[in-house]
């Protein structure tokens, strides 16, 4: 297989004289270079990845006033009947733009995908949740607009309705979605403004594995866009929140016994400036919060939050507080104290993660953490979990610098100007459950 050099790697979004500019750090696979042991204690020789090549300011003049960048993953074919669709990059700026994931060329401006006229009062998007079956965007007025796709293998088939979702209901947040299987993945989460409650937006859409037809069959999409209330005992933890708020919430889906349920991890902040980590999963079309777990982060009280990176297979997050990096686990049934793993001289601007997951026969790969600092420098670290107990709790954590390195420094300095955001671009949704070195 010939892979585009931009299909996977680290994306750095910079503000260059007010304009959105992308840089790209490429992956290089090193074959048979390291020896380790797998989970059965057997010695294995395995491949590794390195970051030697960087293309700085590769894509210029995308637009003005950059705010962030995220990845829109395409349809991951399981059995090969429908072709796997890779990804797009969406640059959040004054005029949002969507880029081809393999070439980084512009595909469309987001606003051009509306039926007819733009919404009354204009369209200024601030957040989005995009999957291969539907796209949802929240604007600065708190309205969410929905784009339903008729087929699984086209990012731009269909269009946004110019009438806001659910009779002009206002939302104060819209959270990322991760959909890489037809089953058990039918939800986008949003925060309803009037009562500060987390709700579900249906995100249906499935294709027949026995056919090469990419069209979604009707009974899987008829409820897309419907607002559903959480149910069950643990729903109260996200309803009518008065003494706390959701600082951020990110996808945390993991393959548990093959069930592939959607999952999220939320960083909560109390009115007293305390923090708490909450994790939960959701069963398809059963709106109970499942496997709910919370962990108080006492060490982080009164600190200034910057960003959070999730390592979903390994079930921990790294949280940036000012110039500090904190490692926090979410192991069900176990209290885990945050661990300070690094302090920089400069403030952290943004984080992203590459949580490499392969089958156990290859041994465990360390997660990789991308860190951007306010001085324009960018680093990639391996997160080394040491002294792990049978319960899953880790006693010691270190980080090891992977980038910049001796090879990459031959191509220039490690300064990307005014960094706005960073992202590990996975390229293909199948990589979530089985990383391809």
Where are these regions (language model features)?
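Repeat-based blade/solenoid architectures
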Residues: 62-69, 233-246, 297-305, 345-358, ...
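Hydrophobic beta-strand positions that form the internal "hydrophobic ladder"
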Residues: 10, 88-89, 135, 317, ...
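Beta-strand-enriched, solvent-exposed domains that form extended recognition/catalytic surfaces
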Residues: 1-6
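Blade-level signature of beta-propeller repeat domains, shared across WD40, Kelch, NHL, RCC1
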Residues: 360, 365-437
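Acidic, serine/threonine- and glycine-rich low-complexity intrinsically disordered segments
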Residues: 108-324, 329
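Loop/turn-rich, solvent-exposed surfaces of beta-rich toroidal or solenoidal domains
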Residues: 301-379
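Beta-propeller domains
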Residues: 14-75, 79-113
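Short loop/turn segments that connect beta-strands within beta-propeller blades
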Residues: 26-30, 101-104, 150, 204, ...
């Amino acid at each position: 297989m010939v892979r585009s050099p931009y299909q996977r790697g680290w994306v750095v979004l910079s503000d260059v004289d007010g304009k959105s500019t992308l840089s790209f750090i490429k992956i290089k696979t090193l074959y048979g270079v390291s020896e380790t042991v797998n989970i059965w204690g057997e010695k294995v020789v395995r491949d590794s990845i390195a970051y030697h090549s960087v293309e700085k300011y590769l894509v210029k003049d995308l637009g003005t006033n950059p705010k962030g960048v995220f990845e829109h993953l395409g349809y991951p074919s399981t059995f090969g009947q429908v072709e796997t669709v890779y990804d797009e990059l969406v640059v959040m700026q004054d005029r949002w733009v969507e880029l081809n994931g393999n070439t980084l060329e512009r595909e469309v401006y987001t606003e051009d995908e509306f039926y007819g006229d733009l919404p009354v009062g204009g369209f200024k998007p601030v957040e989005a949740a995009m999957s291969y079956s539907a796209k949802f965007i929240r604007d600065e007025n708190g309205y969410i607009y929905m784009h339903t796709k008729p087929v699984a293998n086209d990012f731009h088939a269909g269009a946004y309705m110019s009438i806001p979702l659910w009779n002009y209901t206002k939302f104060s947040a819209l959270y990322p979605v991760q959909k890489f299987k037809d089953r058990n993945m039918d939800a986008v989460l949003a925060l309803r403004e009037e009562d500060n409650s987390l709700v579900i937006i249906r995100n249906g859409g499935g294709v027949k594995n026995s056919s090469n037809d990419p069209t979604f069959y009707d009974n899987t999409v008829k409820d897309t866009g419907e607002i559903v209330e959480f149910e069950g005992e643990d729903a109260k933890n996200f309803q009518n929140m008065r003494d706390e708020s959701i600082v951020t919430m990110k996808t945390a889906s993991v393959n548990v016994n093959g069930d592939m349920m959607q999952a999220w991890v939320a960083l909560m902040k109390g009115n007293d400036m305390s923090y708490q980590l909450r994790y939960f999963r959701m069963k398809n079309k059963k709106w109970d919060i499942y496997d709910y777990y919370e962990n108080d982060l006492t060490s982080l009280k009164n600190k200034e939050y910057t960003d959070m990176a999730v390592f979903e297979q390994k079930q921990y997050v790294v949280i940036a507080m000012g110039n500090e990096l904190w490692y926090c686990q979410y192991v069900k049934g176990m209290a885990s104290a945050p661990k300070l793993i690094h302090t920089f001289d400069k403030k952290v601007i943004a984080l992203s993660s590459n949580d490499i997951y392969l089958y156990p026969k290859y041994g465990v790969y360390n997660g990789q953490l991308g860190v951007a600092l306010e001085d324009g420098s960018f680093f990639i670290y391996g997160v080394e979990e040491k002294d792990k107990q049978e319960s899953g709790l880790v006693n010691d954590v270190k980080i090891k610098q992977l980038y910049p390195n001796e090879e990459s420094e031959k191509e220039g300095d490690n300064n990307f100007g005014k960094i706005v955001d960073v992202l590990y671009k996975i390229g293909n949704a199948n990589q979530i459950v089985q990383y391809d070195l």
